[in-house]
């Protein structure tokens, strides 16, 4: 974890956006890091509900993303906002472009075992089984 002392020693123009000390434990042994750029056209709903094989860290570089993970209320991420997904069993419900007239974009780095798919779509049956874990209204 980066301490306040370490923050003070950063050169001008360098900023720590997010520190997640609990995230390292979720990275599978033998994982590779994949950096992925996601570009969503205006109003694009993004991928259907899905899972990722491991944790990912990301940053919105352009526009606004409607972002929803299982157990968390949906929220709007704007350019400059960071995000974290634990991966594994957690369902990623929404990653939509919240803007009707501009593209939105994010860059993520995912940690996953070599050869695993970037995402796996969740079946309709499982969505019904896990609906009690979804938080659809802001807290």
Q: How should these model regions be labeled?
A:
Residues 53-71, 81-82:
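Glycine- and acidic-residue-biased ligand/ion/polar-headgroup-sensing regions
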Residues 46-51, 69, 76, 95-98:
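Short histidine-centered beta-strand/loop micro-motifs
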Residues 46-49, 116-120:
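Short, solvent-exposed loop/turn elements at domain surfaces
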Residues 23, 27, 41, 66, ...:
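Extracytoplasmic low-complexity repetitive segments enriched in small/polar residues
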Residues 1-34, 76, 120-139:
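A short, N-terminal "cap"/entry segment at the start of jelly-roll beta-barrel domains
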Residues 73-74, 87-117:
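Ligand-binding loop in jelly-roll beta-barrel domains
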Residues 30-31, 43-60:
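A short beta-loop-beta micro-motif enriched in histidine and acidic residues
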Residues 25-32, 37-41, 70-89:
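Short acidic-glycine-tyrosine-enriched beta hairpin
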